[in-house]
């Protein structure tokens, strides 16, 4: 059985716990949240994981997990993932956009090397990451990502200061530029852009367009890649989580799949 600690108990974390509540190969020992969120977390996980402890940090060495899953946002990488890696605990990371922060990727890699652990960046809401990473081996010429979401998904971002999102009546470009800038300006919306960049041409050479489209109620991801392998084009239409329109439901499923690959006898 794989013993897991999870950082975060928001829409993604709760979705993961619900889908895996009956998996005999997985045990969620702890959920890690800030102190002010402990009571809310206990109430949220009670229907799915009544025996899971709610804590503010990793358990003591004797009770440490086999694996840490980060579902809490960018600050969690510094606060929880770095020390877990240093202790030799493998980590699964959802908030891939955080690695655009200067120096953080290097800090995480150094922690993993010191602890002889591994950090796996999850594909989240996007597909074809395996193909893109394989294509990089032979050489990539261009990777272009276009993310199209309903206006409400851009609330709480710099786009809300630039545009009246409730009044948009046509598709509006809210950002165009490098993946590194997209991830810094739209950290809660740019995990896909960062994941594609890290799998492919890097943060500085991956071109990103982010659109607010009032005619849709789903998150649409469009990826074009060209290189020595040839080329591919991917379109994904992902339903957002009801509890968080900034996040695709597929993100939850990608965490579930990654955990299954770690815990089960056969993986794909």
Curated annotation (Swiss-Prot):
Keyword Magnesium: no
Active site: 221
UniProt keywords, alphabetically: NAD, NADP, Oxidoreductase, Plasmid, Pyridine nucleotide biosynthesis
BP-aspect Gene Ontology terms: NAD biosynthetic process
Pfam families, per the entry: Asp_DH_C, NAD_binding_3
Catalytic activity entry: L-aspartate + NADP(+) + H2O = oxaloacetate + NH4(+) + NADPH + H(+); L-aspartate + NAD(+) + H2O = oxaloacetate + NH4(+) + NADH + H(+)
Gene Ontology terms for molecular function: aspartate dehydrogenase activity; NAD binding; NADP binding; oxidoreductase activity, acting on the CH-NH2 group of donors, NAD or NADP as acceptor
Residues binding NAD(+): 125, 191
Pathway: Cofactor biosynthesis; NAD(+) biosynthesis; iminoaspartate from L-aspartate (dehydrogenase route): step 1/1
E.C. designation(s): 1.4.1.21
Miscellaneous: The iminoaspartate product is unstable in aqueous solution and can decompose to oxaloacetate and ammonia.
Entry function: Specifically catalyzes the NAD or NADP-dependent dehydrogenation of L-aspartate to iminoaspartate.
NCBIfam families with a match to the protein in the record: PRK13303.1-2, PRK13303.1-3
Family: Belongs to the L-aspartate dehydrogenase family.
HAMAP family in the cross-refs: NadX (MF_01265)
Protein name: L-aspartate dehydrogenase
């Amino acid at each position: 059985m794989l013993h897991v600690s999870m950082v975060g108990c928001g829409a993604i974390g709760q979705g993961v716990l619900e889908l895996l509540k009956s998996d005999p190969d997985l045990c969620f020992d702890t959920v890690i949240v800030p102190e002010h969120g402990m009571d809310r977390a206990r109430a949220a996980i009670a229907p799915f994981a009544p025996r899971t402890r709610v804590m503010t940090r990793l358990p003591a060495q004797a009770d440490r997990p086999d694996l840490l899953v980060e579902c809490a946002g960018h600050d969690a990488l510094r606060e929880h993932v770095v020390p877990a890696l240093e202790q030799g605990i493998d980590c699964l990371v959802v908030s891939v956009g955080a690695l655009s922060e200067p120096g953080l990727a290097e800090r995480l890699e150094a922690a993993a090397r010191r602890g002889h652990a591994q950090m796996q960046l999850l594909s989240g809401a996007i597909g074809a990451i395996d193909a893109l990473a394989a294509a990089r081996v032979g050489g990539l010429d261009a990777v272009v990502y276009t993310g199209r979401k309903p206006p409400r998904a851009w609330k709480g971002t710099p786009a809300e200061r630039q545009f009246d999102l409730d009044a948009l009546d046509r598709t509006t470009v809210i950002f165009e530029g490098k993946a590194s800038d997209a991830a810094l300006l739209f950290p809660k919306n740019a995990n896909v852009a960062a994941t594609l960049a890290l799998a492919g041409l890097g943060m500085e050479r991956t071109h990103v367009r982010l659109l607010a489209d009032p005619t849709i109620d789903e998150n649409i991801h469009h990826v074009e890649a060209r290189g020595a392998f040839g080329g591919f084009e991917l379109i994904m239409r992902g339903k957002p989580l009801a509890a968080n329109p900034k996040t695709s439901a597929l993100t939850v499923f990608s965490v579930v799949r990654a955990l299954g690959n770690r815990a089960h006898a056969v993986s794909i």
